[in-house]
Amino acid sequence: MEEFQGYFELDRSRQHDFLYPLLFREYIYALAHDHGLNRSILFKNAGYDKKSSSIVVKRLITRMYQQNPLIFSANDSIQNPFFGHNKNLYSQIISEGFAVIVEIPFSLRLVSSLERKEIAKSHNLRSIHSIFPFLEDKFSHLDYVSDVLIPYHIHLEILVQTLRYWVKDASSLHLLRFFLHEYWNSLITPKKHITLFSKGNPRLFLFLYNSHICEYESIFLFLRNQSSHLRSTSSGIFFERIYFYVKIEHFAKVFFDNDFQCILWFFKDPFMHYVRYQGKSILASKDTPLLMNKWKYYLVTLWQYHFYAWFQPVRIDINQLCKYSLDFLGYRSSVRLNSSVVRSQMLENSFLINNAMKKFETIVPIIPLIGSLSKANFCNTLGHPISKPTRADSSDSDIIDRFLRICRNLSHYHSGSSKKKSLYRVKYILRLSCVKTLARKHKRTVRTFFKRLGSEFLEEFLTEEEVVLSLIFPRTYSTSRRLYRGPIWYLDITSINDLVNYENE
């Protein structure tokens, strides 16, 4: 058992001491700034070195430990004017520092793992689009799918306990525990049945949440990988299979309640696939619904007995993949049956053979996307383009560039769509909204501006891939649109476009 318990240990031997002093290093906050946190109010007004010096951070930590930390003296307001504008400003500073510091052990482990596996382009693995080629390759051969909402209400102490396996610095853990208890309500946003991290402080809490989820996923992947030993029915390894069952049951007695071992006998199918995205996960299998039900109860029991997260099994639905659509990451994905009839001739007899092939399709859900465009004042709720109010000092080129940038970003993100009709409609809305905005600014009609801009204006709304492909295949581009009906996945997309992030709205 000691040999197999190593599978459940996430290489915790490389624990790092003395992370607490890093909070007082200026370059830590510079790293946080370079990682895309420049949207924060921390970096809008004052210089960076004035706000993240060791003296300022010491004062912030001292006041956080005080009984009333929101009281600032007049001298501090004069020396640091940004203190008076936002009461939670220093909590953002410390959370950004924490986010960079706690990522250090994980980053070192990731780099060593990639070097050991000789993975050169590791940045491609971070792309959101990298999940779709996997789905195209696997899901077309599967039958049943379950879309699971991962329990989100995690106790603060469990998040801290997760980091204790990685960090032995008691001062850092104590400060982190105090910080979470003090500012939890101001740093998260409850919404419906889940809890969303506020947009101002996502990095630290997303890291803590992901590290917590990886704890149960490590056990989940172990059981899935070890189930491959059960595929063979040869009598020569029958005793090995029995021995493996004994090891699984012993693991259940050590880590879980005794009732848990009765549902561990089902791991006979190696075609179970697991995908996690945002706060949800997908389970898909080639086997029967009975196997899916057993995996479902395994997950629920794992969450309840080991991670203390209550979850109701009835909330996990199991559906046939050919009759169900998955909405995630701005796409609607499904597996469709494409039938084709082939005539076969044998001597004087002819036969009609009906072939059915499964195909994984990804389309752009136009209704939610129009809703997002409507909230951004590009169109009304019915999808009719409207003019967008602009500043009086905005030039025509600035307005056009802004619309072109939005159009190309959406086209770039939705380039993997199997059907381009919805994408063409989005381009039409943005193009006509741009013309109406210019006409409104100059107090002229839309027709007048169309004549003034000419056909070159319409060509500017072509996406990057369309321009490149039209240069490579000019004849095909001019005669047929079939060239662009296939999905094109990009491995440089690391964040979801705000206009397509419907699930958080």
Swiss-Prot record:
Pfam families in the cross-refs: Intron_maturas2, MatK_N
Gene Ontology CC annotations of this record: chloroplast
Leader peptide range in chain numbering: none
Domain of life of the source: Eukaryota
Coiled coil, from the record: none
GO annotation terms (biological process): mRNA processing; RNA splicing; tRNA processing
Function: Usually encoded in the trnK tRNA gene intron. Probably assists in splicing its own and other chloroplast group II introns.
UniProt cross-references to InterPro entries, sorted A to Z: Domain_X, Maturase_MatK, Maturase_MatK_N
Compartment annotation: Plastid, Chloroplast
Gene Ontology molecular function, alphabetical: RNA binding
Primary location class: plastid
Protein name: Maturase K
Family, per entry: Belongs to the intron maturase 2 family. MatK subfamily.
Species in which this protein is naturally found: Syzygium samarangense
Keyword check for Transport: no
Keyword Lipid biosynthesis carried by entry: no
UniProt keyword annotations, A-Z: Chloroplast, mRNA processing, Plastid, RNA-binding, tRNA processing
